[in-house]
Amino acid sequence: MDFRDYLREQAELHPAMKPQDAMKMIYQASFGAEHLLEDEEAARNYLIQELEQVPTTTRIPLFEDISEDMCRVNLGAWKGKGLPADWLFKIFALSASEHKNGEETFVKLLEEADDAAARGWLEFTHEEWQEYKKEYLKDGIRAVHHSDSYRKAEAPAYRLAARCFCRLAPVLEKAAGHGPAVIAIDGRAASGKTTMAGALRLILDGSVIRMDDFFLPLELRTEERLKMPGGNVHYERFAKEVLPHLGRGEAFSYRRFDCSRMEIDSREVEVPPSPWQIVEGSYSHHPELGDYADIKVFSDIDAQTQMERILIRNGEEMAEILRSRWIPLEEEYFSTYKIAEAADVKV
């Protein structure tokens, strides 16, 4: 989809859209919401007040995409799912960082809006759009409110968010219904497990334990061990150094496997105290670790996108090693233990 498609989709969802509302969408897609966060405490309090006042609903989508990178989070739907205001504010604040090339993006999206209006895709004529655009540009690029007619008909109540946070919604819903918990994120290589864990850490003020720190040492990589599904993770050390601390919210430390030296590092990884503990990485749902996780998440990806990401991230040589050796081992583990099927949440 390009921006014209997002405009068209918004026009279909909200027939009261006027040229002013399209311009607001262009500005939001280009610059985000940084201008709304000059006073974080005031912005937080305003969100809490607005959530208290907005009607609870399950009839509208939680997210509405407005560009390739940005979406609107509907407050009524957020409230309807019982999600905390503080989590939404953190998502909003994390999404409001300075957008690069904002003016360049604005000019590009303006051209796409011209084309969408000329094609008759929007709820106003091309002439109306051109007239509004001309008047708007006289005072330079700036944020605008929704039009009066849009506010009256649509009663917009939302916050902007980066679309990367949309993927977390099912996990956050599960977490909200559970309370402080141990979350384990398993899944396919390059599916976004690390990114997801990092985002959850920021939203939940959580701590992260990485399964990459528990690669199997060379001396344990016997033919017999590697024939075992999921045998290439050092689950014995994880069980000894990590499991006793999970679910307690306490600070602790563990040793990490140093891939550059192919041995366990004597320096320890410090895990800060937190009621939300996130175990991230392949084999984090291994049955040898027991049923330690309160919420099991499986992160999925299709094979083509997976290899495209691995090529960009790791280069051709490592991509071939992953494709021919490590990914088949992962897939055998997923299949043998029905890892995806046993997860509480699949994203």
Feature locations, PLM:
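Long, basic/Gly/Ser/Thr-rich N-terminal segments
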Residues: 1-147
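N-terminal pre-Walker A segment at the start of P-loop NTPase domains
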Residues: 150-176
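Pre-Walker A (Motif I) flank of P-loop NTPase domains
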Residues: 178-183
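P-loop (Walker A) phosphate-binding loop of NTP-binding proteins
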Residues: 188
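Conserved lysine of the Walker
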Residues: 193
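Conserved nucleotide-sensing/catalytic segment adjacent to the nucleotide-binding pocket
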Residues: 207-210, 216-270, 276-277
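ATP-dependent NMP and nucleoside kinases share a basic, alpha-helical "lid"
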Residues: 263-313
